[in-house]
Amino acid sequence: MRLIAENLGGERGGEAVFSGVGFALDQGQALVVTGPNGSGKSTLLRIIAGLLPKAEGRLLLENGGDDFPSIASACHYLGHQNAMKTALSVVENLRFWRDFNGRGDSGVEEALDTVGLGGVGHLPFGYLSTGQRRRAAIAKLLVSHRPLWLLDEPTAGLDKASEARFAGLMAGHCAGGGMIVAATHLPLGIEGAELRMGVAG
């Protein structure tokens, strides 16, 4: 499987944010997108996820097979918002995302244990602290089983121990043949190529 971007351009509010972006990402690889605020990091991820239209260029997924015929079917996007219902329990939220992504055999409790939230699955999501909410959102990645993780500032709200745990999860995902595109202004603790946005020329 290979994700390819050629001469991509993005807009926000009708104004060009970036242009000429290109990269190729193979299974087992990560791409870390850096740059100042307003340089288009989030816009790029949303374009890859299919949440925003691209202004120009080409974006395609090669060799996804029958399981992943498109980028949308292959990716799970973790944005600034955790995309969890505050009134539902943590387990109910994760079951929704597991079923929505067609992976009904995934272990929700196991995912919670992996992110250090074992024992809180029965609580309403709204009861959790900021860091716990982010870890619960990270657990969505584990129950969705999508090969392409699109991560926008994924460690926001995490303490150092949780950051280290997540770095291990990302490394494990890539070691298993997964791919990651992560936008960040903080070190993520993973090996990968860097794409710096907002650089003249």
UniProtKB/Swiss-Prot annotation:
One of its GO terms (molecular function) is ABC-type heme transporter activity. Residues 3-200 form the ABC transporter domain. It is found in: Cell inner membrane. GO terms for cellular component: plasma membrane. Keywords: ATP-binding, Cell inner membrane, Cell membrane, Cytochrome c-type biogenesis, Membrane, Nucleotide-binding, Translocase, Transport. InterPro entries: AAA+_ATPase, ABC_transporter-like_ATP-bd, ABC_transptr_haem_export_CcmA, P-loop_NTPase. It is an enzyme of class 7 (translocase). CDD domains: ABC_CcmA_heme_exporter. The keyword Translocase applies. Its main location: membrane. GO terms for biological process: cytochrome complex assembly. ATP binds at residues 35-42. PROSITE patterns: ABC_TRANSPORTER_2 (PS50893), CCMA (PS51243). It catalyses: heme b(in) + ATP + H2O = heme b(out) + ADP + phosphate + H(+). It is a peripheral membrane protein. Part of the ABC transporter complex CcmAB involved in the biogenesis of c-type cytochromes; once thought to export heme, this seems not to be the case, but its exact role is uncertain. Responsible for energy coupling to the transport system. PANTHER family: ABC TRANSPORTER I FAMILY MEMBER 1. Belongs to the ABC transporter superfamily. CcmA exporter (TC 3.A.1.107) family. The complex is composed of two ATP-binding proteins (CcmA) and two transmembrane proteins (CcmB). This is Cytochrome c biogenesis ATP-binding export protein CcmA. The lineage of its organism: Bacteria, Pseudomonadati, Pseudomonadota, Alphaproteobacteria, Hyphomicrobiales. The gene is ccmA.
